[in-house]
Amino acid sequence: MGFLKLIEIENFKSYKGRQIIGPFQRFTAIIGPNGSGKSNLMDAISFVLGEKTSNLRVKTLRDLIHGAPVGKPAANRAFVSMVYSEEGAEDRTFARVIVGGSSEYKINNKVVQLHEYSEELEKLGILIKARNFLVFQGAVESIAMKNPKERTALFEEISRSGELAQEYDKRKKEMVKAEEDTQFNYHRKKNIAAERKEAKQEKEEADRYQRLKDEVVRAQVQLQLFKLYHNEVEIEKLNKELASKNKEIEKDKKRMDKVEDELKEKKKELGKMMREQQQIEKEIKEKDSELNQKRPQYIKAKENTSHKIKKLEAAKKSLQNAQKHYKKRKGDMDELEKEMLSVEKARQEFEERMEEESQSQGRDLTLEENQVKKYHRLKEEASKRAATLAQELEKFNRDQKADQDRLDLEERKKVETEAKIKQKLREIEENQKRIEKLEEYITTSKQSLEEQKKLEGELTEEVEMAKRRIDEINKELNQVMEQLGDARIDRQESSRQQRKAEIMESIKRLYPGSVYGRLIDLCQPTQKKYQIAVTKVLGKNMDAIIVDSEKTGRDCIQYIKEQRGEPETFLPLDYLEVKPTDEKLRELKGAKLVIDVIRYEPPHIKKALQYACGNALVCDNVEDARRIAFGGHQRHKTVALDGTLFQKSGVISGGASDLKAKARRWDEKAVDKLKEKKERLTEELKEQMKAKRKEAELRQVQSQAHGLQMRLKYSQSDLEQTKTRHLALNLQEKSKLESELANFGPRINDIKRIIQSREREMKDLKEKMNQVEDEVFEEFCREIGVRNIREFEEEKVKRQNEIAKKRLEFENQKTRLGIQLDFEKNQLKEDQDKVHMWEQTVKKDENEIEKLKKEEQRHMKIIDETMAQLQDLKNQHLAKKSEVNDKNHEMEEIRKKLGGANKEMTHLQKEVTAIETKLEQKRSDRHNLLQACKMQDIKLPLSKGTMDDISQEEGSSQGEDSVSGSQRTSNIYAREALIEIDYGDLCEDLKDAQAEEEIKQEMNTLQQKLNEQQSVLQRIAAPNMKAMEKLESVRDKFQETSDEFEAARKRAKKAKQAFEQIKKERFDRFNACFESVATNIDEIYKALSRNSSAQAFLGPENPEEPYLDGINYNCVAPGKRFRPMDNLSGGEKTVAALALLFAIHSYKPAPFFVLDEIDAALDNTNIGKVANYIKEQSTCNFQAIVISLKEEFYTKAESLIGVYPEQGDCVISKVLTFDLTKYPDANPNPNEQ
């Protein structure tokens, strides 16, 4: 058996440079401190044996180069080589080199591909993917903690059955799908076989059904031929009768044309008059509109004049105020000028007096030259003696001058403050006057605004009321027009009704209180639903005229005859015989007395209503009406809500469409009232439109009110600003100035007290200085004849100072007065400009008022003229309206003539209409019969035309105007009239039937026979008429499905075979490994435990396919009962995991086994057991290379490889090799040393 002999490393991880490690013995231990690089040596062995980079604790291959992790790679390449030795064979070298970012593989220094490299290693029993040659650090604990599923994955990896998992899953899916397809096609084939059987039965039923259907068709043709034959006979008869009546109508038409021509002429004249009347109405409307436009202009002109007058009054007041200010300012300025003249005069008088005093003083103090020198010398000497005093006096003088300047400044400020206070007082006065003026203007504006608002409110109310009323009138007019439109009274009928209404009014006037009116006008059904029923019961009595007596009725009939009116029915209340109402009928359920569902007025016409209604009952439906009429022992007259009437005699009459039209007359009797309402509303609408036209005037007033409101707002804002800003600010500044003025007095007095006090001190100093001067100048004073030297100096200097001071006072007064005078002049000019401005404003406003008054008068004149023209037009309109009424009366007389002719024409037209209606009905019946034959696919025998010539009526589109519905129907009838039917198949007995009852009896017989045949046909469930086609289709489908089923069955068989093949291969791989491990594990566990009572066994959860489920692993520790793996102690678990690990390794064992710290979790006892086991196995089964930190373990090895670190930029690992075979068990316990 071969073994790993040497490892050569160059710049790999912590191993810098080239290092040769080895030789490795059968049991070699790698030892060294933590962090020295022991695991890196294991990584080197893994690397050279082809392990992936990700399992070497780095991200990229470059990181394996020494120094690369700290950014200082020792070289750009690294490599690891392994020398493998076998007995009787040459050593082989396997090397893996890092070049750039990839690996290069070499065998005996020859570069090979990775797959060749892997194959060579596999030949030696080294499986790269299964990693059967190494155990990483922590792998033992990981194996101990694995669950059954994870153990299965481990076995899949070791046995390489996992490589077949993807192909296994794929083939299993294909097999399942193929089996599903086979099952689907089997069921489909079974279903189609059932369909084939069902189709055969359907075909037999269809043949029988077709025979019965042919018999029904023959009976239908016979019935339809019978109906059509007698229909055509009736149409021919009606056509002859219609032609005769049309000739009579032509004669009456010619007679009516003459009367109508006369009526047309009158209409033209009436039309002309009405157009003239409309023109006058148009002119009235235009003048009215013009007047409505002019009135706002007049109001605006009047408002402008009023506004300008108010403005003028305000300007005059402003002018008066400005003139008052100007006079006051002029007086103040005159006073200042007088004061200026007074000061100038005083100054001149002072100058003159000084001149006189100068001349009057004759004394001359002029010195000689030697005396002057002496004076200066003595003066210098005196100055030296009094130098100290002079310095003190100079200091006092400086202080005194500073205080005097302060005093002058305060007095000047005081004067300026007094002037400012006067100015503020004037401004305050102006502010107060402006406030008074603004308050007066605001009061006036508010009054004007109230007036405008009042006027606006009145106009708004009037216009809004007019708008609302116009909307209401328009709504009412629309309702009236809709109701009038719904009445659908044609022109002739309207004229007839108008004629009858006029006669009715005439006889009411002739016999007041005796003629009550028509029955329809005096009563009304309580609910709309009873209208048709009440109409049916009242019948012809609806239009009967109710009178109080028979005599009144006869007189009325005579009057109608004289007026050539239509015949009328009269119901005299004293002549009618009425049976009393049967009170028992009121107790019947589902019925009411007709008289109880009618309201009537006046009460005494009840007799006439009882006569018309009798004891008739109204019911909700036809069934109730029939039941009550004929169902009891006594018959009653009843009527349903739809108008179906059941007479006691047994006669039943239906609610025809003309009855509904007649029932609408309950609503039509309000037409006259609606017309009157329409006229009244139209007139009111015109009046309201006039009021609505005042909107322009309202907008004008609103605009003026808005302008006035804005001016008022600005004035109020100005007033508020003047009060709160200008006046308040001036008062505040005045108060501040007065406060400052009050402070000037104390400050000036304080300065004056300081100056007076200092003057006293200066006086004392001067006296001391004077004593020194007197001593020095004593002899000199005697020489010049003065008491002391000061008398000489003061005479000359004092006078000059006094004069200068006095002149300064005069100048100050003139300057102050000049400043005030300049200010007053400027203010006076401003006041004069204001006076001039207000004078111009007053003059301009007066001129504008004159113009505005003229404009106001001009608008007033236009309004008066327009109103006069409007009144003239209204008079013309009344005259023209009278002419139109007269012309209407003339036309009414002609209409009466036309009415007589129209009556005869109407009678004939009614007869023609009746014939045409019957004829139209017969044509419609023929059309319906033909259409029914076409729709029911009844093939009639035709001698001319085809069934395609029979038309089906379709509704015309909304936009179709070319052909009306009736015209289209006529075209259809005409086209169908060309169809000739061959009645040869119709029995002669059926053709000979003439009487209506006979025809009806024969038709019922034919219909009954047809019904019996159809009943038999209907009882047979409609078969599938396409049964033959279905049968052929099902046969084809059955053959197709059988083919598909056979193909699916073959595919399923093939897929199952393919799956079984891959399943077997996967099972064989897995089972070979599992059986090997399961067989060896118990023996290995006993050897590791050093006890034959220890047991270990593996069991698959799924014996048939163990790789699909988990693998259970259980151990019984020596001297203990069976417990699950989870309940074993840490050491026991580790020993069990090692047993599994060594058992797995025993399956296709690698020649060497590299283990990284497998003793980490073992106690000393178990360490010894494991070490001894490994030592035993290494002698015969495999070479063991173990990384360990425990002496109890590595002392059992044959050689030691020691790894120690050296410090540099990163850790550098160095290696020492120590052969222990030279010291066999010399020191079994090194700790004793």
From Swiss-Prot:
<dbReference type="InterPro" id="IPR027417">
    <property type="entry name" value="P-loop_NTPase"/>
</dbReference>
<comment type="subunit">
    <text>Forms a heterodimer with SMC3 in cohesin complexes. Cohesin complexes are composed of the SMC1 (SMC1A or meiosis-specific SMC1B) and SMC3 heterodimer attached via their SMC hinge domain, RAD21 which link them, and one STAG protein (STAG1, STAG2 or meiosis-specific STAG3), which interacts with RAD21. In germ cell cohesin complexes, SMC1A is mutually exclusive with SMC1B. Found in a complex with CDCA5, SMC3 and RAD21, PDS5A/SCC-112 and PDS5B/APRIN. Interacts with NDC80, SYCP2, STAG3, BRCA1 and BRAT1.</text>
</comment>
<dbReference type="Pfam" id="PF06470">
    <property type="entry name" value="SMC_hinge"/>
</dbReference>
<keyword id="KW-0158">Chromosome</keyword>
<feature type="coiled-coil region">
    <location>
        <begin position="991"/>
        <end position="1068"/>
    </location>
</feature>
<feature type="coiled-coil region">
    <location>
        <begin position="163"/>
        <end position="503"/>
    </location>
</feature>
<dbReference type="GO" id="GO:0072423">
    <property type="term" value="P:response to DNA damage checkpoint signaling"/>
</dbReference>
<keyword id="KW-0539">Nucleus</keyword>
<dbReference type="InterPro" id="IPR028468">
    <property type="entry name" value="Smc1_ABC"/>
</dbReference>
<feature type="modified residue" description="Phosphoserine">
    <location>
        <position position="957"/>
    </location>
</feature>
<comment type="similarity">
    <text>Belongs to the SMC family. SMC1 subfamily.</text>
</comment>
<feature type="region of interest" description="Disordered">
    <location>
        <begin position="348"/>
        <end position="369"/>
    </location>
</feature>
<keyword id="KW-0131">Cell cycle</keyword>
<keyword id="KW-0547">Nucleotide-binding</keyword>
<dbReference type="GO" id="GO:0005634">
    <property type="term" value="C:nucleus"/>
</dbReference>
<dbReference type="GO" id="GO:0031981">
    <property type="term" value="C:nuclear lumen"/>
</dbReference>
<dbReference type="Pfam" id="PF02463">
    <property type="entry name" value="SMC_N"/>
</dbReference>
<dbReference type="GO" id="GO:0030893">
    <property type="term" value="C:meiotic cohesin complex"/>
</dbReference>
<feature type="modified residue" description="N6-acetyllysine">
    <location>
        <position position="1037"/>
    </location>
</feature>
<feature type="modified residue" description="Phosphoserine">
    <location>
        <position position="966"/>
    </location>
</feature>
<dbReference type="GO" id="GO:0009314">
    <property type="term" value="P:response to radiation"/>
</dbReference>
<dbReference type="InterPro" id="IPR010935">
    <property type="entry name" value="SMC_hinge"/>
</dbReference>
<feature type="region of interest" description="Disordered">
    <location>
        <begin position="947"/>
        <end position="968"/>
    </location>
</feature>
<feature type="modified residue" description="N6-acetyllysine">
    <location>
        <position position="713"/>
    </location>
</feature>
<keyword id="KW-0132">Cell division</keyword>
<feature type="modified residue" description="Phosphoserine">
    <location>
        <position position="358"/>
    </location>
</feature>
<dbReference type="GO" id="GO:0003677">
    <property type="term" value="F:DNA binding"/>
</dbReference>
<protein>
    <recommendedName>
        <fullName>Structural maintenance of chromosomes protein 1A</fullName>
    </recommendedName>
</protein>
<dbReference type="GO" id="GO:0005524">
    <property type="term" value="F:ATP binding"/>
</dbReference>
<feature type="binding site">
    <location>
        <begin position="32"/>
        <end position="39"/>
    </location>
    <ligand>
        <name>ATP</name>
    </ligand>
</feature>
<keyword id="KW-0832">Ubl conjugation</keyword>
<feature type="modified residue" description="Phosphoserine">
    <location>
        <position position="360"/>
    </location>
</feature>
<feature type="compositionally biased region" description="Low complexity">
    <location>
        <begin position="953"/>
        <end position="967"/>
    </location>
</feature>
<feature type="coiled-coil region">
    <location>
        <begin position="660"/>
        <end position="935"/>
    </location>
</feature>
<keyword id="KW-0227">DNA damage</keyword>
<dbReference type="GO" id="GO:0007062">
    <property type="term" value="P:sister chromatid cohesion"/>
</dbReference>
<dbReference type="GO" id="GO:0051321">
    <property type="term" value="P:meiotic cell cycle"/>
</dbReference>
<feature type="domain" description="SMC hinge">
    <location>
        <begin position="515"/>
        <end position="629"/>
    </location>
</feature>
<dbReference type="GO" id="GO:0006281">
    <property type="term" value="P:DNA repair"/>
</dbReference>
<feature type="modified residue" description="Phosphoserine">
    <location>
        <position position="970"/>
    </location>
</feature>
<dbReference type="GO" id="GO:0000776">
    <property type="term" value="C:kinetochore"/>
</dbReference>
<keyword id="KW-0067">ATP-binding</keyword>
